[in-house]
Amino acid sequence: MADSGLREPQEDSQKDLENDPSVNSQAQETTIIASNAEEAEILHSACGLSKDHQEVETEGPESADTGDKSESPDEANVGKHPKDKTEDENKQSFLDGGKGHHLPSENLGKEPLDPDPSHSPSDKVGRADAHLGSSSVALPKEASDGTGASQEPPTTDSQEAQSPGHSSAGQEGEDTLRRRLLAPEAGSHPQQTQKLEEIKENAQDTMRQINKKGFWSYGPVILVVLVVAVVASSVNSYYSSPAQQVPKNPALEAFLAQFSQLEDKFPGQSSFLWQRGRKFLQKHLNASNPTEPATIIFTAAREGRETLKCLSHHVADAYTSSQKVSPIQIDGAGRTWQDSDTVKLLVDLELSYGFENGQKAAVVHHFESFPAGSTLIFYKYCDHENAAFKDVALVLTVLLEEETLEASVGPRETEEKVRDLLWAKFTNSDTPTSFNHMDSDKLSGLWSRISHLVLPVQPVSSIEEQGCLF
């Protein structure tokens, strides 16, 4: 019971000191001064301290170690220790102060044993206050003397208000504060690094999306430009290629050169006669493997008889100009009343003999004058698929019964005129129907084979008067 009574005043005084903000601030200042004392202890030896300081600090550690002993003869003995022992204790106190900045909390927190229980609690509280004041005064003085710095020592009131328990509490609070300050700083670097990486990744994703959008938005345009460039390059290379790279066709070149001269020799002809005639024969000559012969029908009125004969001959001659061989000439005039089978045989012999001997063109004049049955031989030479000779040209002429042919007559009207004439000549009720004789169906089949191109010829007065002199 006596011990509890003695401890209560001291505990109350400690609680009051803990609750006082000014005391806490003084504890933090004492901690900072203690750290300066550690540096002072390294720079200056404890030997340079004055004797008064040694005596004051000797009381501090001894008071903490003995637990605030009463004023008895033992306290007098403590003051009579040898001087060297006092210096060692001063050094030890500086070392302890450098490590922990304050006296150990265990010794300060424990209640010292009181050898004199007769003292009242108020006397013990007074001695405790004196002890705390002496220990707190020693540290600031040593720090001030050792470092020689311009720091101002704390006041006497603040030193008296501090206690060993509060010094330990201040140290713990400072350590906690440092850990709290360092912890966010240590953790902030990974967080900042992570945020920077996230921002960088987001920026890269945005750039990828922009590139994708840009590609898909401009992709079709780029594709079209590339296709146009390829086509333009192909066309340019095709037209700018040297002439020697194109395979030459001597027959075509000779035909074009000679056919172009006919326009001057036969003036007054329709434009489509030259255009269509050139295109039709040029296509056939340019074909490497023609499937059928080139068959053309020229027609004219009776006033253009000589012009028709001369023009058809020169067109066939232009077609075979590369071979330097004249075309085959067959005339149906004067054979109307001959035997159709005989005429058919003669026509077959002349065409086959000439084509087999290298002639590439044949001119059949007055096709309308042949016996009807004899014209069936042209199935053999003008068939679409099974013609006997496919790389040849057959030029047929039909003289209309009309006296004149208007220049305004077009190709279709000209074709109808020729067709009507042949139907009138080759089909009638008096003609017997047999295999060797013509009928309407056979004539329709023949017409489809020989009527690829029907062109009108206008008379040339000089030719009609003087004949074909060239």
UniProtKB/Swiss-Prot annotation:
Its main location: endoplasmic reticulum. It is a single-pass membrane protein. Residues 236-470 are annotated as: Interaction with TOR1A. Residues 2-214 are cytoplasmic. The modification N-acetylalanine is found at A2. Residues 236-470 are lumenal. Residues 1-18, 108-130 have a biased composition (Basic and acidic residues). It holds the Pfam family LAP1_N. The modification Phosphothreonine is found at T176, T193. The modification Phosphoserine is found at S13, S93, S120, S163. Residues 1-174 are annotated as: Disordered. One of its GO terms (biological process) is endoplasmic reticulum organization. GO terms for molecular function: ATPase activator activity; ATPase binding. InterPro entries: LAP1C-like_C_sf, TOIP1/2, TOIP1/2_C, TOIP1/2_N. The chain crosses the membrane at residues 215-235. Required for endoplasmic reticulum integrity. Regulates the distribution of TOR1A between the endoplasmic reticulum and the nuclear envelope as well as induces TOR1A, TOR1B and TOR3A ATPase activity. Interacts with TOR1A and TOR1B (ATP-bound). This is Torsin-1A-interacting protein 2. It comes from Homo sapiens (Human). The gene is TOR1AIP2.
